[in-house]
């Protein structure tokens, strides 16, 4: 039991630094924005109260969304609220782009939600887009003062305050999820961007390519076959919620499905991202691809430039270590406990006397190489019955001597003299089992 307690204590202590680091980092990043977050929460709560008038059936008509959010959402009482909030956020993105059509001929891939850590180690998020095909406009979603938006655009015509509030609420939580890597690694710096985690799998006759922490703008994911773009059979976009340290963080996950056949084994899943790097505001295209069957685990993280943030490494136990901690060590500790308890009971049941036959046998076994047979003589006055047979059975066990116990006294006699010994001629000898 002590071993189990020590193992559990070691496991808790080993993971404590990483947990403290995550909570401290979140507290610092969110604490600096606490006032603004309170305002945005009021806006979002107002949207949640309107949910009774907006059912899932008329979301497409009201929200004008192109995304299908009917995928696998987190189960729980707040899943419907998350689903609705996802529709609201995507609708406001579309509302922004609808207004941008008046000043820009570009599509979604020239706009970007940029998350980064500035020189003061403060979390920042900006919405950057190309206006009139010549000018980049950057909107700081963490700053309530919008007066610095570029003069070339009449912002009031399409950038409504409600949209900016909702996008600010989303961006703040998305950027925390985007920058804080729960394994102790942060990607920012020159690129200020962490690419989505991409993996593929087979699923009931389909090849599914999934981009986790996917951004709905600035990124394009598609199937490719022999360097040619291939349309997908089905696309699913999920609005994912993560809760840590009491804060809700949001991100997207997009999945492409393609019917699988023997002739289409060369399918690859490609992601292209047109990154608008701030403050230089230079367009740079980062692209990568991987085969669907080669290594379907997070290949994107090894493709884009990455920067490591000094953070404690959280120890992870492998299956063998978990087997020892939760199965082998508890069983061994339990067996040891039962053994000690049994010996303890035997000692007190036997009375602890050195003249006890069992204790005599233990001493003799420890000193003699040949096992000793204990012969108990009850009261030393019984008449022997079938005396020769008793002695014959003794001779089969030991060749030189036997142990005789009479009352509180024990002694050894030679087998050769036992027949002629007068004091034992009228004694019944009973063999005790070893």
Swiss-Prot record:
Keywords: Glycoprotein, Host endoplasmic reticulum, Host lysosome, Host membrane, Host-virus interaction, Inhibition of host innate immune response by virus, Membrane, Signal, Transmembrane, Transmembrane helix, Viral immunoevasion. GO terms for cellular component: host cell endoplasmic reticulum membrane; host cell lysosomal membrane; membrane. The chain crosses the membrane at residues 322-342. InterPro entries: Ig-like_dom_sf, Ig-like_fold, Ig_C1-set. Residues 1-15 form the signal peptide. It is a single-pass membrane protein. It comes from the Viruses. GO terms for biological process: symbiont-mediated suppression of host innate immune response. It is found in: Host endoplasmic reticulum membrane; Host lysosome membrane. Plays a role in the down-regulation of the host stress-induced NKG2D ligand UBPL1, which enables immune cells expressing the NKG2D receptor to recognize and annihilate infected cells prior to viral spread. This is Glycoprotein U20. It comes from Human herpesvirus 6B (strain Z29) (HHV-6 variant B). The lineage of its organism: Viruses, Duplodnaviria, Heunggongvirae, Peploviricota, Herviviricetes.
